[in-house]
């Protein structure tokens, strides 16, 4: 059976944890940050867990993660 290809776009955006979940960056922290509070920007800087409903799609895109 041939090797499965990894979706490179997904590989740059998601990282797998030891428990098999996937971590992602949060949205809304790219630009237009002047009016956002420091507390909000700190919160947006943290990683988030991919929702379980989307995790299966991410797993298919990253077969070796």
Curated annotation (Swiss-Prot):
Q: Report if keyword Calcium is assigned.
A: no
Q: Which SUPFAM superfamilies match?
A: L35p-like (SSF143034)
Q: Name one GO biological process term.
A: translation
Give the record's keywords alphabetically.
Ribonucleoprotein, Ribosomal protein
What terms describe the molecular function in GO for this protein? Answer: structural constituent of ribosome
State the Gene3D superfamilies in the record. Answer: 4.10.410.60
One Gene Ontology cellular component = cytosolic large ribosomal subunit
User: Is Ribonucleoprotein a UniProt keyword of this protein?
Assistant: yes
Disulfide-linked positions:
none
Write out the similarity annotation: Belongs to the bacterial ribosomal protein bL35 family.
Q: What is this protein called?
A: Large ribosomal subunit protein bL35
